[in-house]
C-alpha cells in the first residue's frame, strides 16, 4: 500500500488563512499520528496530500466564467512570464502543516493549464468541445511552468512534489463547460503529448518528480468507453500497450506504470461495485500497470444514502464510503485510496465540514464519522504495508468463497506494515452485531488492540478492550473496527 489521502481543493486557500486555532485543529484531524493520554488517535494520519496547482481564474473574477469565488484559483505565473511566489498562500500553509505532521507524498494536480496558455483564455472549457483547452504552441510552456512550480515549492516551502498530474478527469463527458470550476477535457493523444512534454521539461531540469496519468472520471473510461468516443476511452490500453504507437508512454522517462482513476458513478448498484472493479483490475494486470484511486465523493446516483446533497456527519455516509474503500482495494487492487475534498460545505464531498462567513475570511470546521471511518484505514495501514490474503471459513471449517466480502454484512481486509505489525480492518454494514474469530500465523502476535468507529460521542477510533489472537470478538452493528497486533 502506498498511502491514503485527500485534496486541498478548494477550501484550503481560505481555511489556510483562518485563525491558528482553526487551522491547527483541521491539520491535526487530517494528518496527526499522535494519540491522547488514553491512547485515542488525535487525527487520521493521512500520508498523501493533493495540491491543486491554480490556473489563474481568481484574478479574472466573474469574467472567469466560474460563479463562486471559492472555486477560483490563483496562479504562480504572471502575464509577463515572471513568477509570483506569494500566490496560493492558504494552500501552501497546509502543505507545510501536512509535512510537519509526517506527510511525505505530495501530488500537484492541474484542473486547467494557466489561462495565458488556453484556447479560450479561461480555466473552464466554456464554448468548446471535447479537446484540450491548450494552444498547440504552449505545450512546452505548460510543461516548463509545471517544472518551475516543482522547483519553486521546494525552494520556498521545502515541499517536494512526488507526482504531478497534467490533467484531471479529461474523459468527463460534460466537457468541463462552466460555471462551476476549472477544468478541461483532453483526448488520449493530447494527454500523451502533454506527458511527453512534461517528461522532457523535468528531465532537462534534473527533476525526479513522477508524471501521473490520467485521473479518469470513471473507471469505465480506463478499460473501455463510457459516454465518450474511443479517443477518450481505453486509457490503460492507450498509454501502456506498445501497439498504441501514438499514445504509448511505457518508455517515457518520469512516467511510472501507474494509472490514477476516480471511483465516481461506479458504486451502485452493488453488483456493479464489484464487477466494474474486476474488469478494471483484469485490464491493469494484463498490461502490468498499478492503480491508485485518487478521488471520489458522494454523487447524485448514490441513492442508498440520499445522494450528494446535504452534509452528513453520521455513520450512514461513513459506512457507505468504507464499503467503497474495501471494494477498491480488494477488487480493483488500489495501492492508494484518496478522498476528494478534505474540507467541504453543505455537500457530501468533504471529510470535514466548514462554516464560513460570506467572504470566506473566517469560520470554523467540524469533524464527521466519515473522517474517522477513513482513519480506520489511513491511521493504521501505513505506506509500505502489504495487503494480505484472507481465508474465511464457516462454523464447520469449510472455506467460504469471497468470505471476506459481505456487502451488507462484514467486509474484512488485512495488512502487514513495514514495521512488522499486523492490521485488520473490519466493516460491519449490518444492523445487528456480528461475531467472528480470526488469527494470523505469527507467534509474535499475542493479542489485538481494536479501534472502534461507530455512532455516538467519542467513538472515533476509540480504543476498546484487547482481543486475544484466535479468540472470538464481536463487531458492533453499523461500525468499523481496526485491529492492530500487539
PLM regions and their residue ranges:
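Noncatalytic carbohydrate-binding groove/subsite architecture in carbohydrate-active enzymes
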Residues: 151, 181-324, 331
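Solvent-exposed loop/turn segments at secondary-structure junctions
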Residues: 9-14, 54-58, 112-116, 167-173, ...
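Structural recognition of the beta-strand scaffold that forms the well-ordered cores
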Residues: 2-8, 47-53, 57, 105-109, ...
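Aromatic/acidic polysaccharide-binding cleft in carbohydrate-active enzymes
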Residues: 290-381, 385-401
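Carbohydrate-binding surface patches
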Residues: 397-444, 478
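C-terminal beta-strand-rich structural cap/linker in extracellular carbohydrate-active enzymes
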Residues: 463-486
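N-terminal catalytic cores of secreted or lumenal carbohydrate-active enzymes
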Residues: 1-161, 174, 181-192, 196, ...
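Solvent-exposed beta-hairpin/edge-strand motifs
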Residues: 441-460
Amino acid at each position: 500500500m502506498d498511502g491514503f489521502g485527500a485534496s486541498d481543493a478548494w477550501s484550503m486557500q481560505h481555511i489556510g488563512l483562518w485563525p491558528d486555532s482553526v487551522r491547527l485543529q483541521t491539520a491535526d484531524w487530517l494528518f496527526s499520528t499522535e494519540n491522547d493520554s488514553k491512547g485515542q488517535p488525535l487525527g487520521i494520519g493521512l500520508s498523501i496530500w493533493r495540491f491543486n496547482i491554480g490556473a489563474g481564474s481568481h484574478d479574472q473574477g466573474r469574467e472567469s466564467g466560474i460563479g463562486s469565488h471559492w472555486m477560483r484559483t490563483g496562479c504562480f505565473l504572471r502575464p509577463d512570464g515572471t513568477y509570483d511566489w506569494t500566490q496560493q498562500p492558504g494552500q501552501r500553509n497546509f502543505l507545510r502543516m501536512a509535512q510537519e505532521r509526517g506527510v511525505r507524498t505530495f501530488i500537484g494536480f492541474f484542473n486547467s493549464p494557466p489561462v495565458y496558455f488556453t484556447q479560450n483564455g479561461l480555466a473552464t472549457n466554456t464554448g468548446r468541445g471535447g479537446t484540450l483547452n491548450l494552444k498547440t504552441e504552449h505545450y512546452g510552456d505548460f510543461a516548463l511552468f509545471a517544472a518551475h512550480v516543482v522547483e519553486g515549492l521546494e525552494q520556498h516551502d521545502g515541499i517536494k512534489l512526488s507526482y504531478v498530474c497534467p490533467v484531471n478527469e479529461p474523459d468527463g463527458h460534460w466537457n468541463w463547460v462552466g460555471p462551476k470550476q476549472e477544468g478541461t477535457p483532453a483526448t488520449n493523444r493530447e494527454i500523451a503529448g502533454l506527458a511527453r512534454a512534461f517528461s522532457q521539461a523535468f528531465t532537462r531540469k534534473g527533476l525526479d518528480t513522477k508524471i501521473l496519468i490520467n485521473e479518469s472520471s470513471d473507471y469505465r473510461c480506463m478499460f473501455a468507453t463510457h459516454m465518450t468516443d474511443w479517443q477518450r476511452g481505453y486509457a490503460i490500453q492507450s498509454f501502456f500497450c506498445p501497439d498504441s504507437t501514438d499514445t504509448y508512454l511505457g518508455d517515457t522517462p518520469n512516467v511510472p506504470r501507474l494509472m490514477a482513476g476516480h471511483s465516481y458513478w461506479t458504486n451502485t448498484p452493488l453488483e456493479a461495485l464489484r464487477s466494474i472493479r474486476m474488469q478494471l483490475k483484469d485490464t491493469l494486470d494484463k498490461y502490468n500497470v498499478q492503480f491508485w484511486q485518487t478521488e471520489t465523493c458522494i454523487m447524485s446516483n448514490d441513492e442508498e444514502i440520499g445522494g450528494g446533497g446535504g452534509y452528513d456527519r453520521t455513520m450512514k455516509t461513513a459506512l457507505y464510503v468504507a464499503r467503497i474503500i474495501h471494494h477498491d482495494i480488494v477488487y480493483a487492487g488500489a495501492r492508494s485510496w484518496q478522498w476528494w475534498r478534505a474540507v467541504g460545505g453543505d455537500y457530501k464531498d468533504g471529510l470535514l465540514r466548514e462554516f464560513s462567513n460570506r467572504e470566506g475570511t473566517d469560520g470554523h470546521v467540524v469533524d464527521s464519522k466519515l473522517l474517522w471511518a477513513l482513519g480506520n484505514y489511513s491511521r493504521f495501514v501505513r505506506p509500505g504495508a502489504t495487503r494480505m490474503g484472507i481465508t474465511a471459513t464457516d462454523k464447520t471449517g469449510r472455506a467460504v468463497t469471497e468470505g471476506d466480502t459481505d456487502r451488507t454484512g462484514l467486509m474484512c481486509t488485512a495488512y502487514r506494515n513495514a514495521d512488522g505489525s499486523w492490521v485488520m480492518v473490519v466493516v460491519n454494514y449490518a444492523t445487528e452485531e456480528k461475531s467472528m474469530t480470526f488469527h494470523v500465523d505469527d507467534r509474535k502476535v499475542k493479542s489485538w488492540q481494536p479501534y472502534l468507529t461507530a455512532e455516538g460521542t467519542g467513538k472515533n477510533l476509540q480504543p476498546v478492550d484487547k482481543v486475544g489472537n484466535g479468540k472470538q470478538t464481536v463487531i458492533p452493528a453499523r461500525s468499523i473496527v481496526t485491529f492492530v497486533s500487539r
